[in-house]
Amino acid sequence: MIIGHGIDLQDIAAVQRAHERSSRFASKVLTFKELEIFTSLKGRRQVEYLAGRWAAKEAFSKAYGSGIGSLRFQDLEILANNKGAPIFTKSPFSGNIFISISHSKNYVEASVILEENNL
C-alpha cells in the first residue's frame, strides 16, 4: 500500500548560485559517497547532480511526512543501481521506495513514492 508521495522542483540556476556562495553547500546536501560522484562530474552535469539529489531528498521528506528539519540530508543517500537508475541506499524507511529524477534546461524535478512492504 502506498503511504506517501512527495515531489519537489529545484531551479538549477538557484542551486548553482547557492553552491558558488558556499563551498560547504554540496557537503551539507550530499553524503560522502554522493560527494565523491559529485566531484568526479564537470560543468553543468555537476550542478544537475546536486540539484537532483537535493530535489529527491526534499521529495522523500514530503512523502515521509517529516520535511527536512527533523530529517537531515545526511540521513538519505541516493546512488545508482546497475542500470544507472537512482535508488535510495540509505533512509529511515524500511519499505519500498520508488524514485524518479527528471532534468530540463532550467529545472530538476523529483518524485518519491513510499510503499509499505506486504504484511
UniProtKB/Swiss-Prot annotation:
Gene Ontology annotations of biological process type: fatty acid biosynthetic process
An annotated Gene Ontology molecular function: magnesium ion binding
Gene Ontology CC entries for this record: cytoplasm
Keyword Transferase included in the entry's annotation: yes
Enzyme Commission no: 2.7.8.7
Cofactor(s), names only, from the UniProt record: Mg(2+)
Localization terms from the record: Cytoplasm
EC class name: transferase
Domain of life of the organism encoding this protein: Bacteria
Keywords in alphabetical order: Cytoplasm, Fatty acid biosynthesis, Fatty acid metabolism, Lipid biosynthesis, Lipid metabolism, Magnesium, Metal-binding, Transferase
List of residues binding Mg(2+): D8, E58
Reactions catalysed according to its record: apo-[ACP] + CoA = holo-[ACP] + adenosine 3',5'-bisphosphate + H(+)
Family to which this protein belongs: Belongs to the P-Pant transferase superfamily. AcpS family.
The protein's role, per its UniProt record: Transfers the 4'-phosphopantetheine moiety from coenzyme A to a Ser of acyl-carrier-protein.
Protein name: Holo-[acyl-carrier-protein] synthase
Organism: Streptococcus mutans serotype c (strain ATCC 700610 / UA159)
